[in-house]
Structures are given as C-alpha cells and as structure tokens.
C-alpha cells in the first residue's frame, strides 16, 4: 500500500491506474479504524480493482473544538490494518492540504432539506462540513464507486442526495452496520465509554429492536413509540438527543401510507454520543 499526503501525488498515481482501465473504489474515513471500517474495505474489493481509502479528521464537521481535539488519531496502526486488508492507496492529508486558505474561506456545500434535521439539528453545520469534504475528496480521487456505512444513515442520505443534485457520476453503496456480539454498533466513539458505560451501551440497539417490533405490531402511534423508547434509554442511563421514526426515502416525517421507514436515534452516554438506526419495511 502506498500512502500519499498531497493531492498532486495521489492524482498522479491514480491517473496511471485509470490509463490501465482500472475501476477505482473509494472508502473515506476519519481513522481510528475498527472492524466496521474493514467491512467497507471488503465490500470495496468486491466492487473494483483499486481500493483507495482516506484518513482525514475533518475540522469542518466539528462544531466543538474539544471534540475535534480528542478524536483518536492512530495513523500508523490504521496504515497497518488497511494494508493487511488489501487497500492499495491511502490518502492522509493534513488540514492545510485540504483547506489551504483555511476552513472559513472554503466554499461550502449544503444539501438542503436534510442537513439541518436529526443529527444536523443538534450539531449545526456538521453536514455542511461532511458534504464539503466528501465533494473535495470525490474531486481528488475521482472514484467510480464510494462505500459508506449504514450506521450513519443520515450521512449516507446526505451524500446520496448530494451526488444526485450535483450530477456526480460516483456510484454510492451503503454497507450494513457492523455490530459487536452484544449488538452495539461498532464506532470509534465507543472508545470514550467507561467499562460500566460499555456494559450499558447495547441498550441503544435493544431499544431500536423494541421500537421496530412495536411498529410492526402497530402497538402505538409513532410519537408514543418514540417517547417510550426515550424513557427506556433514560432509565438505562442515557441522556436523550433524539429518537425518531422517519421515511427512508427523505428522512421526513412519514405519511400514514409510508411503508419504508427507518428508526434513528442519538443519545449521550457519559462523554460519548452514540448513534444507531434500524430500517423497517411494513
């Protein structure tokens, strides 16, 4: 695996691969890699010839400077893991390479109607940062296909809508959430949990399963299911952010006729903000 830190070097290497008619698949990350990321790499290997990953902790998507500063940075270990799993190229730029004039002078991309709800409501500007950096990375890598996890379902929808709205020819593939044996979704933020919090954390997945069953059995209104779910999480020790039932297609409040739903939640446990979701087909 070759590692590049500048746009020019990566573009030169990938130009050679394209001249060989190789299909390029891209897996963007923020590092601190775990088995969930490796499931994306495995999917990428099924979809093309050349696997490119990136590691960049994007300051534009952090409204809390302290959260940015404490985000785990494990580049050398990440490089070993990526190489062992068949990644061909790693792009690991610094903030100056990505935002040479500073992030405040950076042109911004906002996907309207979906960026300021759910996680976007509690993290203002987050998805503008995501959309902007992913657009830049797509322009740098110019992949045929890009792979994202379904764990951050809203992020996936933002990127899908962005690609559609900007007439990009990158194919977006979502991969099912990778989970620990107890159901907790794999996440770099799980490392913020204490031993006791880690024991409690799977409650978030168990509550999603309960809500899915309640939906399928039509036990109560969406509002009542969400409120009961919030109470279950709070009883276990979580602090609420949101627990919502939305339409898969656009993440808006679903009509009574909507059959393809997604249950999404974000909740705080100690210093960690955990997110998860489950799709439901009625």
From Swiss-Prot:
Major enzyme class: ligase
Record keywords: ATP-binding, Cytoplasm, Ligase, Nucleotide-binding, Pantothenate biosynthesis
Amino-acid positions noted as binding (R)-pantoate in the UniProt annotation, renumbered to this chain: 61, 155
Membrane-spanning segments: none
Superkingdom, natural source: Bacteria
One record GO biological process: pantothenate biosynthetic process
E.C. code: 6.3.2.1
Record: residues binding beta-alanine: 61
GO CC annotations on file: cytosol
Protein's pathway: Cofactor biosynthesis; (R)-pantothenate biosynthesis; (R)-pantothenate from (R)-pantoate and beta-alanine: step 1/1
Record: residues binding ATP: 30-37, 149-152, 178, 186-189
Localization (cell): Cytoplasm
GO function terms (MF aspect): ATP binding; pantoate-beta-alanine ligase activity
Keyword presence, ATP-binding: yes
Active site location: 37 (proton donor)
Catalytic activity: (R)-pantoate + beta-alanine + ATP = (R)-pantothenate + AMP + diphosphate + H(+)
Protein function: Catalyzes the condensation of pantoate with beta-alanine in an ATP-dependent reaction via a pantoyl-adenylate intermediate.
Entry's family note: Belongs to the pantothenate synthetase family.
HAMAP family reported in the protein's UniProt record: PanC
Miscellaneous notes: The reaction proceeds by a bi uni uni bi ping pong mechanism.
Complex and partners: Homodimer.
The protein's name in its UniProt record: Pantothenate synthetase
Record organism: Marinomonas sp. (strain MWYL1)
Gene behind the chain: panC
């Amino acid at each position: 695996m070759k590692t590049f830190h500048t746009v020019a070097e990566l573009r030169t290497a990938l130009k050679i691969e394209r001249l060989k008619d190789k299909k390029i698949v891209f897996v963007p990350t923020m590092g601190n890699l775990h088995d969930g990321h490796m499931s994306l790499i495995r999917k990428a290997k099924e979809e093309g010839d050349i696997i490119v990953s990136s590691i960049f902790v994007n300051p534009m998507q952090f409204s809390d400077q302290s959260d940015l500063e404490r985000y785990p940075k494990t580049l050398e270990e990440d490089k070993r893991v990526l190489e062992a799993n068949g990644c061909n190229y790693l792009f690991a730029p610094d903030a100056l390479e990505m935002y040479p004039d500073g992030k405040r002078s950076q042109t911004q991309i906002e996907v309207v109607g979906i960026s300021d709800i759910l996680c976007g409501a509690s993290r203002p500007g987050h998805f503008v940062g995501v959309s902007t950096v992913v657009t830049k990375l797509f322009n740098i890598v110019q992949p045929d296909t890009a792979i994202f996890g379904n764990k951050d379902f809203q992020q996936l929808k933002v990127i899908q809508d962005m690609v559609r709205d900007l007439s990009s020819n990158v194919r977006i593939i979502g991969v099912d959430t990778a989970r620990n044996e107890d159901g907790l979704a794999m996440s770099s933020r799980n490392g913020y949990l204490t031993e006791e919090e880690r024991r409690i954390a799977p409650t978030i997945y168990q509550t999603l399963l309960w809500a899915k069953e309640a939906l399928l059995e039509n036990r109560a209104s969406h509002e009542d299911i969400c409120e009961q779910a919030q109470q279950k999480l709070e009883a276990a020790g979580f602090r609420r952010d949101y627990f919502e039932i939305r339409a898969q297609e656009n993440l808006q409040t679903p009509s009574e006729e909507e059959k393809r739903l997604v249950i999404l939640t974000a909740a705080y446990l100690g210093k960690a903000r955990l997110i998860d979701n489950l799709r439901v087909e009625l």
